């Protein structure tokens, strides 16, 4: 079953075409990696799906619902959660306070407490450090907090923008483990990456974006790491 479908998507920044006639289908319950160099349009696609950026052309469907032009909170309410690049935490707020900001769609304190308890099952370290300022966490811990905050809206799909950027090999391994664990619990994940080994290590399906256009779609097993890298950076 297809969870998200993109048809002929075009997105501009002024006169610059950032995304050019992109079509994608994301099956439910899978991890899909969107690979590309910096500036290839990967993050723009995530922003457009999540309502942060308007499209010039094309359609985006979440299930049977067209979400182009929909308000951000309505997109979140449908079940889409964006984990932005750079974490975007509030440094002077505690872990607990940052988490609660992700629960603004929940109707009561009891509901927030219930969802937070579910999230803590995935991230017991965050429960132990609930009253610590997020600025006191390591980069990897901050990334885990960013993911945890995204889960507070009880999404069906996670959009993850470069979650391993700037992290140590140990924390990269932890993030990859987290992605797989969340997927095994039923979450569909669209992972944006420029690092081939990270993307292929968790993906069920891969798209490669170059200069705003899809140049490859297929299984991680279809090409070697070297061949994937060439497709990202070299035309032809």
Please place each PLM-identified region on the residue numbering:
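ABC ATPase C-loop
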Residues: 150-151
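Helix-to-loop junction immediately C-terminal to a conserved catalytic motif
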Residues: 50
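Conserved ABC ATPase signature
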Residues: 133-137, 141
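The feature captures the beta-strand-to-loop junction immediately N-terminal to the Walker
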Residues: 35-37
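Catalytic Walker B motif of ABC-type/P-loop ATPase nucleotide-binding domains
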Residues: 158-162
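Conserved ABC transporter NBD signature motif
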Residues: 58-67, 78, 111-116
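ABC-type ATPase nucleotide-binding domains, specifically the catalytic core motifs of the NBD
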Residues: 14, 32, 70, 95-114, ...
